[in-house]
């Protein structure tokens, strides 16, 4: 990159695939982690059901509800300005 951050979009992802570009994707469940990943030019941030094991202390992901995922996705969404 030339120092200018551009927002990653779904069409941009398609373009990356067509060009053989590797996509960087990491997981975040909280504002600070998502902000750091966004500032590090990570192209996609995943919020997944592993939040149940990582943040909630469950032994599996089965107890995670849709409301849990929505809650963490909203937090991550507030932190991210460039990543998808």
What are these regions (language model features)?
Residues 24-27, 45-47, 84:
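Hydrophobic faces of well-ordered beta-strands that scaffold small-molecule active sites
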Residues 1-27:
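N-terminal amphipathic alpha-helix/helix-capping segment at the start of soluble metabolic enzymes
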Residues 8-11, 58-84:
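Alpha-helix-loop-beta-strand connector modules within alpha/beta enzyme cores
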Residues 33-34, 44-70:
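Glycine-rich, proline-tolerant flexible connector loops at the mouths of alpha/beta enzymes
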Residues 26, 30, 37, 76:
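Conserved, mostly hydrophobic/aromatic
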